[in-house]
Every structure is written in C-alpha cells, then in structure tokens.
Amino acid sequence: MKVTLLGASGGIGQPLSLLLKLHLPAESDLSLYDVAPVTPGVAKDISHIPTSVEVEGFGGDDPSEALKGADIVLICAGVARKPGMTRADLFNVNAGIIQNLVEKVAQVCPQACVCIITNPVNSIIPIAAEVLKKAGVYDKRKLFGITTLDTIRSEKFIVQAKNIEINRNDISVIGGHSGVTILPLLSQIPHVEFTEQELKDLTHRIQNAGTEVVEAKAGAGSATLSMAYAAMRFVVSMARALNGEVITECAYIEGDGKFARFFAQPVRLGKNGVEEILPLGTLSAFEQQALEAMLPTLQTDIDNGVKFVTGE
C-alpha cells in the first residue's frame, strides 16, 4: 500500500505526515511531496520513528516521482484560511494549484484513489473530477472530498453537550464542507434526544467551528491539527478498505445526483473505492428544512468548480 501526500510541508501537511507514519497499516509506503525544499528533511525526520511505514520525501516543482505507484493520493496543498476569509475566498488561489496536481495524478497514477482536503472542498472536488474526466481517467468511485473534520467536531460537541459516549459511525454529516452546507444528522444518533433549540445551536456550532478556530488563532492560522487528525482517520479507513475491510465513512463524492451532483453522505468503502452509497434515513423537520435551504449554495459552489475547468 502506497500513500502519497501532496502538500506535506505545510501547517496541515507536517502533522498529517507524522500521523500517517504512526497509523497507516503496517508495511505501507508513505511518499511526501511539497514545493518547499524542506520536504526531504520532513521525511527524514519522521523516518526515525520506529514504525514499519517507510517514508521518502520529494521537493521541487514536479510531484511525478512521489506519485509513482500510489494507491492513495492525499492532497492538502494550497493556502490556508485567514481571518475574514470564507472558504470561497480561497478559491482563486487553490483552484489552480489543485488543477495542476490532479493533472499530474492523471498522468502518473490514474488508478489511485484521490482524497482532497484543500478548501473550498465544495468547488475543488468538481475541479478534480473535470480534470480527470478531461484526461479520460475519471472513476467517480475513487474521488473523495474529506469532510471528516465535520464528523469529528460533531462527535466532540455532542459528547460535550450531552455527556454521553457515541460511536464514530453514529453520526452522519451530509451536504458539503462549508457553512450552511454542513448538516449533521443529530436526530439519528441513538439513545439521545435533542430539543429543537439544542439541534439548532449544535448544528450552528458545527457549521461555524472552523471560524471558531481561525478567530482563536488571532490571524496565525486555521484548523490544522484537528484537520490533520481528521484526514489521517479517513485515509487509514481508505487504506483498510483497499485491503479488503468493509468500512463506512462520510465523504463528499459524486453520487446518484439526488440532491446535487456532488454531495457529502455516508458510503461503504471497499477495494474499488465507493462500493455503496448508504441511505440517509429519516430526517427531522429541522434537518429536512436545512437540507433544502443549503442546496442552492452547494449548487453554486459546484458550478464554480466545473466552470473553472470547462469554461462553461
């Protein structure tokens, strides 16, 4: 199993590299790439940690060497959010970066599962899809926007609010990965009930948790450490699924188009990527209303990504 991390030397990339070295399946290969010349040094640094994951690092303008033979490509390259910026403000900078990297993926390792955390995810995944499609190698089962940060925040905030233990698959977060498009299905969590006000307050906190971190860091960055943990958790699940385990995760994917062409939803992962899109179950009245209200925003985000590549 080979995992390639693109953007390995940044604020998310370095802690994520460390977490992957610690948690990827035994005997995995971890390839780190970043334009920053420090990247081989990051690889050398974590290579001294005694796990069976083998690490190598590559710097420079061309990620091709790092991508050779990759089963999973994880992309966190791009600029981070700053105070006052929305994820959409990041679009013009990060869109071009992702387009260039995904073009390289299409050339070097077209069969790889591509997992992206670069924001704005709602628009970046459509860009990646159109680039892969243009190259003739698009398999929608193998392209993922990682929304796991919304899931882990939901888990933590629910435990804080209700003082209960929940399992990681008890909570589905659907829709997209910014603001009102983030919709945790709190009503479906077993053995716990929420008042209407609790549902609204908790949903609002989950939707705005990224801003909470940006403001708390007072201009010095965004959610990097929790994002690194979330990305590690998803990629380890992906690696286990490719090795034959049946794994359930939420991710932003191109699905059946019921709500939008790209939509975050629970999926069953397997050897081919997405093996099955799982039903959403019954939504509460509040959740149904929130779902319907978010769709125009999500659609605009998707359209922006598609237009960036196709010009249409």
Curated annotation (Swiss-Prot):
Its EC number is 1.1.1.37. Substrate binds at R81, R87, N119, R153. Keywords: NAD, Oxidoreductase, Tricarboxylic acid cycle. It is an enzyme of class 1 (oxidoreductase). The active site is at H177. InterPro entries: L-lactate/malate_DH (IPR001557), Lactate/malate_DH_C (IPR022383), Lactate/malate_DH_N (IPR001236), Lactate_DH/Glyco_Ohase_4_C (IPR015955), Malate_DH_AS (IPR001252), Malate_DH_type1 (IPR010097), Malate_DH_type1_bac (IPR023958), NAD(P)-bd_dom_sf (IPR036291). CDD domains: MDH_glyoxysomal_mitochondrial. GO terms for molecular function: L-malate dehydrogenase (NAD+) activity. It comes from the Bacteria. One of its GO terms (biological process) is tricarboxylic acid cycle. NAD(+) binds at G7, A8, S9, G10, G11, I12, G13, D34, N94, I117, T118, N119, M227. GO terms for cellular component: cytoplasm. It catalyses: (S)-malate + NAD(+) = oxaloacetate + NADH + H(+). NCBIfam families: MDH_euk_gproteo (TIGR01772). Catalyzes the reversible oxidation of malate to oxaloacetate. Belongs to the LDH/MDH superfamily. MDH type 1 family. Homodimer. PANTHER family: MALATE AND LACTATE DEHYDROGENASE (PTHR11540), MALATE DEHYDROGENASE, MITOCHONDRIAL (PTHR11540:SF16). This is Malate dehydrogenase. It comes from Actinobacillus succinogenes (strain ATCC 55618 / DSM 22257 / CCUG 43843 / 130Z).
